[in-house]
């Protein structure tokens, strides 16, 4: 981990926030408007106490209440701080709102579970030294679901949905359960596709699952990944955040890798 003064960290955060946390994924999430649908972390928020009960629906979207859904919610709440838990819940609701309005048929429980577990890779206890956070999260979710007797085929779908959720151009070409996690998380992260959500519906979602501190928390987590396992960000959208704001960031560019290849031309 790189040593930085508190002053430098504060300046870094202000610079990133000032330019928008979505800059690192701007190219990828643009597809939402046109498509079909264990290294220590630099920071680790401590989950605070929260009521166990979820509403039965939000903005007309049913919240699954199966045994597996409740177990996934309990697992996510026990692992992540409220700001991150609220994001994964908004991911599910936004994805469902978009796809329900299109009349798409899908496995609601699977989408819910995949959404609720999709950011486990941003939690220190599930991070490996070398994998992308999406793969760390997909692996952790799959292990959890197999322990809780989800079929191997359905658990594999959840793995794909989580592993591909930042690869919008790929995820939106896959089956709805995979695409919905990408669309919902991208909408909540950068606002792409927000024009599809009426203002009163948006207000209901944000009342149920507030965004309080989400941008700041997301920026902290991106920079933490870039500091603690920079090579895992090779060719990842987050790499530009690290390259721009972390002095001496060691990850090569695509051009660097091409020119360093052991060929004459």
Predicted regions and their residues:
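N-terminal secretory signal peptides
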Residues: 1-12
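C-terminal segment of N-terminal export signals and the immediately downstream linker at the start
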Residues: 31-65
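His-Asp-centered metal-binding catalytic motifs of divalent-metal-dependent phosphohydrolases/nucleases
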Residues: 109-127, 137, 159-168
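N-terminal export leaders
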Residues: 12-34
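An active-site-proximal "capping" alpha-helix that borders the catalytic cofactor pocket
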Residues: 132-147
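Conserved N-terminal diphosphate/IPP-binding helix and adjacent helical/loop segment
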Residues: 58-73, 80-90
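Divalent metal-dependent phosphate-bond-processing catalytic cores, especially two-metal-ion Mg2+/Mn2+ enzymes
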Residues: 21-29, 48-54, 79-85, 89-104, ...
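Internal catalytic or translocation cores that form aromatic/hydrophobic pockets or channels
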Residues: 151-157
């Amino acid at each position: 981990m790189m040593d930085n003064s508190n002053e430098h960290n504060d300046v870094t955060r202000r610079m990133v926030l000032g330019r928008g946390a979505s800059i690192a994924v701007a190219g990828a999430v643009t597809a939402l408007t046109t498509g079909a649908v264990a290294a220590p972390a630099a920071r680790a928020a401590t989950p605070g106490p929260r009521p166990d009960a979820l509403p039965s629906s939000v903005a007309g979207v049913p919240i699954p209440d199966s045994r597996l859904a409740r177990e996934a919610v309990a697992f996510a709440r026990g692992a992540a701080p409220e700001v991150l838990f609220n994001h994964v819940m908004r991911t599910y609701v936004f994805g469902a709102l978009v796809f329900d309005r299109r009349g798409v048929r899908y496995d609601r429980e699977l989408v819910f579970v995949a959404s609720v577990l999709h950011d486990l890779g941003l939690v220190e206890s599930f991070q490996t030294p070398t994998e992308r956070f999406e793969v760390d999260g997909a692996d952790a979710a799959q292990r959890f679901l197999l322990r809780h007797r989800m079929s191997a085929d359905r658990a594999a779908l959840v793995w794909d949905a989580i592993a591909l959720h930042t690869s919008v151009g790929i995820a939106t070409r896959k089956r709805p359960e995979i695409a919905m996690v990408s669309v919902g998380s991208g909408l909540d992260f950068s606002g792409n596709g927000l024009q599809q959500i009426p203002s009163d519906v948006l207000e209901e979602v944000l009342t149920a699952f507030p965004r309080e501190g989400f941008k700041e928390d997301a920026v902290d987590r991106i920079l933490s990944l870039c500091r603690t396992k920079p090579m895992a960000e090779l060719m990842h959208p987050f790499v530009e955040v690290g390259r721009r704001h972390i002095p001496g960031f060691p990850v090569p560019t695509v051009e660097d890798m091409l020119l360093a290849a052991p060929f004459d031309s």
